[in-house]
Amino acid sequence: MQSTTSPMPPLPATAATADEIAVIAGWVAAGYPTGSGCSPVCTSGRTWRGGNDGSPEMNPGMACIQCHQASDEGPRFSIAGTVYPTLHEPDLCDGAPPSSGAQVIITGADGRTLTLAPNAAGNFYSETRVAGPYRAKVVTSGGERTMTASQTSGDCNTCHSLAGANGAPGRIMLP
């Protein structure tokens, strides 16, 4: 975290503050004690109960593209996912609302950007094709959270699930 040649988090992410570094250093100095863990929480207190009715707010947290391909219904998204306020939110829980001011910014390999605003369920999606591999970040007035590696799958919730998969720590989270 404090390296001048290879800082963590890597650029273009925002550098850790001195207070954040002190917390990590204290944890390391204490011998990496195991935390008590965290239970999933539906921060919004709202759960989707509408089934597969075709609403843009349907099935937050679920793998959108996988479902649309399997059912052969609905739009053919190139990018789709859900933004949440915390890392471990259950499937079908509404995510970050539009009032969060969040924008999901996708930058294709060709340098073109696609900016998406999450809806009332936190869902974002687009049928616009993106040149891969692409980069992604979530931006608010309070900062940005950037993926550290380029991606090739636009089905964001496949990896950004309750527990996380394929190296993702959990949900797509607001900065």
Describe the function of each predicted region:
Residues 74-77, 167-169:
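Short Cys/His-rich "knuckle" micro-motifs
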Residues 132-141:
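A short, solvent-exposed beta-strand micro-motif common in secreted/extracellular proteins
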Residues 1-73, 80-82, 87, 91-102, ...:
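Aromatic- and Gly/Pro-enriched helix-to-coil junctions and flexible linker segments
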Residues 151-175:
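Extracellular beta-sheet/turn segments enriched in Thr/Pro/Gly and aliphatic residues
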Residues 81, 118-126:
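Glycine-centered loop-to-beta-strand initiation motif
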